[in-house]
Amino acid sequence: MSLWPFLGKHPRYREHGLLERLCEPDRVIQFRVAWVDDKGQTQVNRAFRVQHNMAIGPYKGGMRFHPSVNLSILKFLGFEQTFKNALTTLPMGGGKGGSDFDPKGKSDGEVMRFCQALMSELYRHLGADTDVPAGDIGVGAREVGFMAGMMKKLSNNAGSVFTGKGIAYGGSLMRPEATGYGTVYFAQEMLRRKQMGFEDRRVSISGSGNVAQYAADKAMELGAKVVTLSDSDGTLVCEGGLTHGMLQDLMEFKNVQRGRLKDFCKQHKLKFEAGKRPWHVPVDIALPCATQNELDAADAKHLIANGVVCVAEGANMPSTLEAVEHFLAAGTLYAPGKASNAGGVATSGLEMSQNAMRLSWTHSEVDLRLHEIMKDIHGNCVRHGERKDGTVNYVEGANVAGFVKIADAMLAQGVC
């Protein structure tokens, strides 16, 4: 674990049991959710909210609706979220929640009734200065809207506790772009430190959803050639690089028509490699933006052999532990997701600030603040991860930077 050497040099953290205290959440809320489906049958699901740590601010983290959700997963995600939020430099603690409810195949009415039933219990544990949830897997704008609406109804308070809301009721501009843009901003800082940039670089991106789309958009804006996107069916390969027109068409096709990438490739006469991931294509920069454990040791070896310079994670933990070890051993610039994809939660923090001030910032204002936050995160990673030879272990840097921020706050507040 990258924290052990640091803890060995700074015994005061060990003397006060900071790591042990961080490994256990402040509290766990678990309850049943009973709701009625379209056939009039009563359904029962389990729901959880892990309030992990609020040493530096209110609990902050997404709600996940997926059959795989259980307490063990959410406790781990809450732990990771605490470190990620600390890296943003914004006053946010860490938390995570969700349910084993599966929104796939459910009608809008069923999803609404479930969200309202869930909030009838959860609302009493939330608040702008207590716990601020957001979306995650299975929880998009629709679900956030249903939950936020029920929260207002039950609390008789117009304060919008959720982030990721629609613009019409307190959401922030730039929230859809934030994670993808932030990933590219972080990679840009990594490259700049080595006197390099995105211009004329070949970039491989996995995924074709929100994060991948906006990572591609920003990389192209910086002069890069985006040569791949992917989905669960396979990989789009465009050796000459996607154009802005192609990307706009793809956004329409994926976000509005809900189409598959292979069908988009047929329409635009683009190469589609069925069943393949994008990491075999020679590139300078790789941005895994799809899902967990999508890039394994064999993929890492392919990328390294083909001369990859930089890997920055847009998804949460897309690289396996073995893949990360290969990148670090090869001296590849590698950014873990808790640092490079923190732009999403950072912009959620900016949404909280706008709500508190009853203001709405412009697109350019939010983008500028996001860019500065990603620069600050990079600087903190360098500060805590730089080696004597000038290289930077961004994994160690991110873990130590996040830990120090939380641990110092906990030390100042005593044993509680």
Q: What is each stretch, according to the model?
A:
Residues 190, 302-416:
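Adenosine-phosphate binding glycine-rich loop
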Residues 110, 142-149, 173, 214-218, ...:
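Short acidic, glycine/serine/threonine-rich loops at helix termini
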Residues 74-77, 147, 183-191, 215, ...:
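Buried hydrophobic packing segments
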Residues 1-174, 408-413:
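N-terminal ligand-binding/catalytic initiation module
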Residues 234-334, 339:
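Rossmann-like adenosine-cofactor binding region
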Residues 163-166, 171-282:
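Glycine-rich phosphate/diphosphate-binding loop of Rossmann-like nucleotide-binding domains
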Residues 130-134, 158-162, 205, 228-231, ...:
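General beta-strand structural signal in soluble alpha/beta enzymes
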